[in-house]
Regions:
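Short N-terminal binding/cap micro-motifs at the start of the first secondary-structure element
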Residues: 48-52
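Short, hydrophobic/glycine-enriched beta-strand segments
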Residues: 38-45, 60-64
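Broad hydrophobic/π-residue packing in well-ordered secondary structure
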Residues: 34-40, 78-83
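Acidic/Gly/His-enriched mid-domain segments of enzyme catalytic cores or analogous surface patches
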Residues: 59-60, 66-172
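N-terminal pre-catalytic "stem/leader" segment of glycosyltransferase-like enzymes
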Residues: 1-35, 44
């Protein structure tokens, strides 16, 4: 018999004695869906220089980590979201987030939001309504990611170490 645990629907972060609540990603929320549209996912790296970005400006686009800085050079008209999967990005390049993040949908891991609560508390206070927690499905719960812990969760460690099969997420976004 398989034990399926429900992922938390929210995560709370204490910022200057104020509890900031960020909802988890939920594909059933209408504003979280692209309704079957094509989408570009642009990450940062040397190959970005070879992309014909002028041809992609009107297509819904998801930016990953530092690629959001491209909105300073190009007029993207349909920003579908911004994904930060690496908490080190927050501490190594804080100016990118400060300069280019203006409330676009932001999807990030708990480790990223923990880093942001320390380095960018004002951004979290202002835009938490546009932020969504992404839970990793490729590793057991409780495994440390980017050297930041999930210690703010109030779940028992025993429950957090259960792997969730991908098939679970078909009916339970």
């Amino acid at each position: 018999m398989a034990l399926y645990l429900r992922l938390p629907a929210t995560a709370g972060f204490n910022i200057d004695n104020e509890l900031i609540i960020i909802n988890a990603f939920n594909a059933n929320e209408p504003e979280q869906s692209l309704h079957g549209k094509d989408v570009n996912i642009i990450a940062s790296g040397p190959s970005i220089q070879q992309l014909p970005l002028s041809e992609l400006l009107d297509t819904p686009t998801i930016f990953v980590n530092g690629s959001i800085s491209l909105i300073g050079q190009h007029q993207f008209t349909d920003i579908a979201g911004y994904v930060i999967s690496d908490a080190r990005f927050i501490s190594h390049q804080p100016e990118i987030l400060q300069q280019y993040y203006k409330g676009q949908p932001l999807y990030a891991t708990l480790a990223v939001f923990e880093a942001m609560a320390t380095t960018h508390p004002d951004i979290m206070r202002t835009y938490h309504h546009a932020m969504r927690v992404l839970y990793p499905v490729d590793r057991p719960w409780g495994v440390k990611s980017n050297k930041l812990s999930f210690n703010k969760l109030i779940f028992k460690k025993k429950l957090l170490n259960k792997k969730m099969p991908l098939s679970y997420f078909i009916n339970n976004p």
